[in-house]
């Protein structure tokens, strides 16, 4: 299950941002998860809930925004947002498409609480 290594890297990134901003804890983690990222949202949530128990993210809520697949057709220049995992242009049925969005997982926003003086 590669979700564990992904969550480990995500929590490390959160910790770096918290340290840079002198935060005592992180209360919310917002990510964008592409449908073609190869990451299963429910497994990612379970892995996050497991890994967050120790450290600065232990009180954090993980919010996952699913990003649909967005393609650009190289033949008809049509840009399409697709709900299915296909790379076929719905306008002209061409396979000559380029993925614009929906393949990645991105950390979008953190909600942090500052250290008390």
UniProtKB/Swiss-Prot annotation:
Binding site for Zn(2+): 73, 76, 89, 92
Entry annotated with the keyword Metal-binding: yes
GO aspect biological process, one term: protein modification process
Family stated for the protein in its record: Belongs to the HypA/HybF family.
Molecular function in Gene Ontology: nickel cation binding; zinc ion binding
Pfam families xref list: HypA
Keyword Metal-binding: yes
Database matches in Gene3D superfamilies: 3.30.2320.80
Residues annotated to bind Ni(2+): 2
Gene name of the record: hypA
InterPro entries: HypA/HybF
Protein name according to UniProt: Hydrogenase maturation factor HypA
Keyword terms, alphabetized: Metal-binding, Nickel, Zinc
Its job: Involved in the maturation of [NiFe] hydrogenases. Required for nickel insertion into the metal center of the hydrogenase.
């Amino acid at each position: 299950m590669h979700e564990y290594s992904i969550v480990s890297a995500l929590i490390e990134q959160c910790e770096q941002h918290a340290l840079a901003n002198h935060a005592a804890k992180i209360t919310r983690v917002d990510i964008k998860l592409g449908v073609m990222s190869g990451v299963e949202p429910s497994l990612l949530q379970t892995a996050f809930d497991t890994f967050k128990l120790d450290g600065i993210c232990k009180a954090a809520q993980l919010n996952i925004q699913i990003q649909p697949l967005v393609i650009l057709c190289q033949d008809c220049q049509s840009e399409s947002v697709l709900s299915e995992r296909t790379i076929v242009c719905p306008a002209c049925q061409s396979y000559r498409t380029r993925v614009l969005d929906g393949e990645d997982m991105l950390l979008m926003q953190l909600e942090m609480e500052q250290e008390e003086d």
